[in-house]
Every structure is written in structure tokens, then in C-alpha cells.
């Protein structure tokens, strides 16, 4: 259910974002970002109905409590992640508007939108490839070997794609927006660095999801957004919006270290 919900949400968001970007520009991208959690929630309700209810011989519905209990950890993790992401994004947009100006907030949103656009496909690949492998009964001592195997397969492809995005950052910016947004090209190095570490972090993070490690998941999520907000507040006056994007990169480095530490602790190493 979690896997299907992620894939459906990713595909629907990508289509909606491309369409709204084409017709409405940056305003359309903002609408698409706001619609993403709504679409995710609706897809989840649909999948939950299919999983938790079964059709009887008389055409009615029979509630299956045991299957619903299995879904609750995934529902909680999805709602926590989606809720925190959008609350923090709104806060940071307001912070940039207050500390710098509205134009800078628009530039930061534009950079965020580009990142969200290509990361939609990365998330879909992870949901199809990584989550099923970790959902299998993998012994704890084989976890690191499995993670290494996944990274050896996916990371080179992701790295090449990100290098291509960086090399063509100016044409991409002009295609999606206009020459007025060309100044965001200076942010690409930090955003792509953040997303590269995010990919590695997600390999281990998806293990927490697959194994329903709720406490560890909550710890990592709260740490993630605390670092992002704290460093953004600290760096925004010195570096402007680049400081916020730098904070995002450091955030995922820290998350990677934390999640590996938690997993090694679980393995007794």
C-alpha cells in the first residue's frame, strides 16, 4: 500500500506540476506543491479502503481490523513526513520574505520546485526497488550488505543524472521559468549536494519504513527539520537564500550519519 501510494502520488504530482508550470509558471508550481499532500492523502484513503475492507458475497463490506493495524505505522509515517515538510516550507518561505525580501523567497521556491520535480521520479524508483527489498526477511547482519548493493546499483545512475542537471542548469531554469530567475543557478551546487546525500540517506531511511521502526523514524524526522530550521536561522543573514540551501545540504549529511548510527546500534556494533 505504501509503495503504491508513493508511486501514484509521484506520478500525479509530476504530471500536475509540469502542466501547471507550463500554463501558470511559478504560481502553477506553488499550486502543484500544495496539492501534493492532498493527492497523497486521497490515494492513501483509496488504498486503505481496498486493504481494510473486503467485499462479502452479498455485496457488502466487511471490516478487517488486523489488516488496518498493519497499515497504521505507514499511515503515521506518511502523515508525519508530509505534515512536517509543508509546515517547514511555509515557515522558511516566510523567514526569507521577512529577513531578505519576497523576490528571494520566490527564487528559493523556484529552486525547491526544480528539486521536487526530479526527486519525484527518484522517490518512485525507490518505492519500486528499495522498499520491496527491505520488506523481505533480511537478517540484521545482512542489512549493510544489502544497502551497499542497492547503492552500487542506483547511486551511479543518480549521480550521472545530477551532473547532467548541473551542467544544463541555465537552460533548465530558462525553460521552466524565465531569464529573471537565472540567479538561482548559483544555488544548484548546494541543492544537488543536498539531494545526493538525501539519496544515500533514503536507502537507510526506507529500511526504517519497511521494518516499521517508528521511534527511530520520528527521531530522524525531528532531527532533520530541527537542523534545517536552526542552520537556516543562523546562516540566512550571512549568506542569504544560499544559506538556507546550504542548511539543507548539511541537514542530509547529518541525517545520514544519524540513521547509520541508529542502525549500527540496532546491530550491536
Which positions does each model-derived feature cover?
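Membrane-interface junctions at transmembrane-helix termini in multi-pass inner-membrane proteins
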Residues: 3-5, 193-220
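Helix-loop junctions and terminal segments of transmembrane helices
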Residues: 54, 111, 115-140, 207-210
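Interfacial transmembrane-helix starts/ends
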Residues: 72, 109, 142-156, 164-168, ...
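Interfacial segments at transmembrane-helix termini and the short loops linking adjacent helices
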Residues: 102-103, 148, 167-196, 242
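Residue-level signature of transmembrane alpha-helical cores of multipass secondary-active transporters
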Residues: 70-82, 86, 90, 94, ...
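Interhelical loop/hinge segments that connect adjacent transmembrane helices in multipass membrane
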Residues: 4, 33, 44-89, 137-145, ...
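Interfacial/gating helices of multi-pass transporter permease domains
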Residues: 29, 66-78, 95-116, 182-185, ...
Amino acid at each position: 500500500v505504501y509503495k503504491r501510494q508513493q508511486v501514484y502520488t509521484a506520478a500525479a504530482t509530476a504530471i500536475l506540476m509540469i502542466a501547471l508550470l507550463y500554463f501558470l509558471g511559478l504560481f502553477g508550481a506553488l499550486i502543484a506543491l500544495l496539492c501534493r499532500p492532498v493527492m497523497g492523502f486521497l490515494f492513501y484513503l483509496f488504498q486503505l479502503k481496498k486493504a481494510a475492507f473486503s467485499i462479502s458475497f452479498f455485496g457488502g463490506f466487511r471490516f478487517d481490523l488486523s489488516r488496518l493495524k498493519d497499515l497504521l505505522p505507514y499511515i503515521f509515517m506518511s502523515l508525519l513526513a508530509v505534515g512536517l515538510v509543508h509546515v517547514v516550507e511555509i515557515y522558511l518561505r516566510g523567514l526569507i520574505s521577512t529577513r531578505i525580501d519576497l523576490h528571494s523567497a520566490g527564487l528559493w521556491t523556484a529552486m525547491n520546485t526544480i528539486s521536487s520535480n526530479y526527486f519525484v521520479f527518484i522517490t518512485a524508483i525507490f518505492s519500486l526497488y528499495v522498499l520491496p527489498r527491505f520488506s523481505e526477511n533480511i537478517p540484521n547482519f545482512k542489512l549493510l550488505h544489502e544497502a551497499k548493493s542497492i547503492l552500487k546499483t542506483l547511486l551511479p545512475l543518480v549521480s550521472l543524472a545530477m551532473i547532467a542537471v548541473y551542467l544544463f542548469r541555465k537552460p533548465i531554469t530558462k525553460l521552466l521559468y524565465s531569464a529573471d530567475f537565472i540567479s538561482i543557478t548559483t544555488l544548484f551546487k548546494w541543492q544537488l549536494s543536498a539531494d545526493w546525500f538525501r539519496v544515500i540517506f533514503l536507502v537507510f531511511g526506507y529500511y526504517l519504513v519497511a521494518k516499521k521502526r517508528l521511534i527511530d523514524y520520528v527521531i530522524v524526522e525531528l532531527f532533520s527539520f530541527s537542523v534545517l530550521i536552526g542552520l537556516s536561522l543562523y546562516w540566512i543573514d550571512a549568506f542569504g537564500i544560499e544559506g538556507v540551501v546550504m542548511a539543507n545540504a548539511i541537514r542530509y549529511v547529518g541525517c545520514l550519519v544519524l540513521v547509520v548510527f541508529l542502525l549500527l546500534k540496532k546491530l550491536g556494533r
